[in-house]
């Protein structure tokens, strides 16, 4: 779990499950950061404590339903399944995003799980590529992956030149800009 921030909305099991989901959506390692290394779980937790607070019940019910599905399929809660098993479960859920309950063969858990997986997928993307001020994208990992230099006051003529490698520009966050501005006063 993250060293940058305390988890406040999730209990330890829920946090481990959502973090495992995010880590399969954007896998990584220490040398090639993914969602786990970029602290996406911190972003999701902070979002649920704030603007996305209305989604807390979805996350709680979603984790419970995902664990039931994982136990039925693989005999263990989702966070304890192998990466291959997690990939298979998530792949199935994301392939059929939020099927209607009146669809033949779709039960309440399947509909809930597909919607839940889609929301976690969206929040994982937000947490990986949003400004680090919101809890995820630790050290600009997502921005570095894209070659995006982050928040800027502007660009030089050289940086605007066609073919310029923006990966040469140091990553700058909103907090970096605030510090720069405060230093000018």
Where would I find each of the regions flagged by the language model?
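Glycine-rich, often acidic-flanked micro-motifs
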Residues: 29
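Short glycine-rich loop/turn motifs that provide flexible caps or phosphate-binding loops at active sites
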Residues: 33
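Mature-region segments of soluble proteins
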Residues: 2-4, 14-16, 20, 39-185
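Substrate-recognition/specificity elements adjacent to catalytic centers across diverse enzyme folds
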Residues: 24
